[in-house]
Each structure stands twice: as structure tokens, then as C-alpha cells.
From Swiss-Prot:
It is found in: Spore core. Signal peptide: none annotated. This is Small, acid-soluble spore protein Tlp. InterPro entries: SASP_thioredoxin-like. NCBIfam families: SASP_tlp (TIGR03090). Transmembrane segments: none annotated.
Length: 80
């Protein structure tokens, strides 16, 4: 019988800050595009877009908090 256990990848956090910054930028772009699309949206669609953009803003705040955590961890050598 073959052993199907896969060894987990090592924890590589070296580029987490950059990935999170990209995620913030992409989310901001999505918000801007959504705002532009509201020009052609029905009232119901506008409401959904506004709600989604509110959730996107919450995500951005979470990303920024995580960026701070990751930056601090990077400065401290990723020690637990």
C-alpha cells in the first residue's frame, strides 16, 4: 500500500506583506470599478454594490492590520 501522506510545505512568510499590499490595491480598484458601474445600475443593484463595497472596506482594514502584524513579525525575524 502506498503512503499518500504529503509533507506540509514550510511556513514561508517572506512575501506576505507584499501579497497583502497587492490585495489592498486590488480591492480598492474593485471598489472604484463598482462605483463606476453604479451609473448604469438599478436602485436594487446600487444597494447591493454599496453593501459589497462596505464589506470590501472592512476587508481592507483587516488587510492593513495584518500588514502591520506581518511587518512586525518580519522585523522580529518571524519568531513565535
Amino acid at each position: 500500500m502506498t503512503n499518500n501522506y504529503q509533507k506540509p510545505n514550510p511556513d514561508d512568510r517572506s512575501d506576505n506583506v507584499e501579497k497583502l499590499q497587492d490585495m489592498v490595491q486590488n480591492t480598492i480598484e474593485n471598489i472604484e470599478e463598482a462605483k463606476e458601474s453604479m451609473e448604469f445600475a438599478t436602485d436594487e443593484e446600487k444597494q447591493r454594490i454599496q453593501e459589497k463595497n462596505a464589506r470590501r472596506n472592512e476587508s481592507i482594514e483587516s488587510f492593513r492590520s495584518e500588514i502591520q502584524d506581518e511587518s512586525a513579525a518580519r522585523e522580529n525575524g518571524y519568531q513565535s
